[in-house]
């Protein structure tokens, strides 16, 4: 399945594993926009931006990260549910940690079920093992559209205020001006509506979110949220989460990226 990779911002939820002999086997779940920087902060201690629960207990290894969330809010909600499965109404079917069950194994068990229930089951997520020697098969396995990757995430470009466009695309946008119309319903597109554009080079598709959602859902009757579909113009495969994430990438402020620096749960010394 050939999906266009969208440039944009990185939102990940990671799993740390403690290598300190005194605390070996401890784990920690957190949110980050920069995995390499975040693990350095954890190992440097709370004064350097690490979390209270990890401070002074290193070294820590970031062994696994889930990324591909369409927004920081979506990633933070996933983080909270992974940290507190017993409090999430989505995970009432997941049993508590067994006495003989290691913390690492328990968190993988919870993760396996999270990836199989709404709303996460329909997100374009990637499960990435940063330490392949820690890899375990999840049961149940992730959905087919969620790839399993290994090694560090690919470098992320600096987030521009506006995406770079070719000269031809720029001229096309100028020609459209304020009279741009939806490729599907032919009604006018308003800037505040955030029209979706196909990311494949040269594709002219511009559509209302609701129009493209209805088009995609023709392939998935009975669903409320599209998972994927084929562009009505170029016929190439697209993931819905990538399209929506690309639409909103330019409207979010860079300051939101620092949500990872001081999580409110780090202040609860329990």
UniProtKB/Swiss-Prot annotation:
One of its GO terms (molecular function) is zinc ion binding. Expressed in testis, colon, bone marrow, brain, thymus and to a lesser extent in heart, kidney, skeletal muscle and spleen. CDD domains: GIY-YIG_SLX1 (cd10455). Keywords: DNA damage, DNA recombination, DNA repair, Endonuclease, Hydrolase, Metal-binding, Nuclease, Nucleus, Zinc, Zinc-finger. Residues 9-94 form the GIY-YIG domain. Its cofactor is a divalent metal cation. It is found in: Nucleus. GO terms for cellular component: Slx1-Slx4 complex. A zinc finger (SLX1-type) spans 182-234. Pfam families: GIY-YIG, SLX1_C. Its EC number is 3.1.-.-. InterPro entries: GIY-YIG_endonuc, GIY-YIG_endonuc_sf, Slx1, SLX1_C, SLX1_endonuclease, Znf_RING/FYVE/PHD. One of its GO terms (biological process) is DNA repair. Forms a heterodimer with SLX4. Catalytic subunit of the SLX1-SLX4 structure-specific endonuclease that resolves DNA secondary structures generated during DNA repair and recombination. Has endonuclease activity towards branched DNA substrates, introducing single-strand cuts in duplex DNA close to junctions with ss-DNA. Has a preference for 5'-flap structures, and promotes symmetrical cleavage of static and migrating Holliday junctions (HJs). Resolves HJs by generating two pairs of ligatable, nicked duplex products. Belongs to the SLX1 family. This is Structure-specific endonuclease subunit SLX1.
């Amino acid at each position: 399945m050939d999906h266009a990779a969208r440039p944009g911002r990185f939102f990940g939820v990671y799993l740390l594993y403690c290598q300190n002999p005194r605390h070996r086997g401890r784990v920690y779940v957190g949110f980050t926009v920069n995995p390499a920087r975040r693990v350095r902060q954890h190992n440097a201690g709370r004064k350097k931006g690490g979390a209270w629960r990890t401070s002074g207990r290193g070294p820590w290894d970031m062994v696994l990260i889930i990324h591909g969330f369409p927004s920081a809010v979506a990633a933070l909600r996933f983080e909270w549910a992974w940290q507190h499965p017993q409090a999430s109404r989505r995970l009432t079917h997941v049993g508590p940690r067994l006495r003989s069950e290691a913390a690492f194994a328990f968190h993988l068990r919870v993760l396996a079920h999270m990836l199989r229930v709404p709303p996460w089951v329909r997100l374009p997520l990637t499960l990435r093992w940063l330490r392949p020697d820690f890899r375990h098969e999840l049961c149940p396995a992730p959905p087919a559209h969620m790839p399993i990757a290994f090694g560090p995430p690919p470098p992320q470009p600096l987030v521009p205020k506006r995406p770079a466009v070719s000269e031809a695309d720029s001229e096309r946008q100028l020609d459209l001006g304020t009279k741009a119309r939806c490729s599907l319903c032919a009604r006018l597109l308003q800037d505040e509506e955030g029209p979706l554009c196909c990311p494949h080079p040269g594709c002219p598709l511009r559509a209302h979110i609701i129009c493209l959602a209805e088009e995609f859902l023709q392939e998935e009757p009975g669903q409320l949220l599209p998972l994927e579909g084929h562009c009505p113009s170029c016929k190439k495969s697209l993931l819905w989460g990538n399209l929506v994430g690309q639409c909103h990438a330019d409207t979010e402020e860079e300051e939101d990226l620092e949500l990872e620096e001081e999580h409110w749960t780090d202040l609860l010394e329990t």
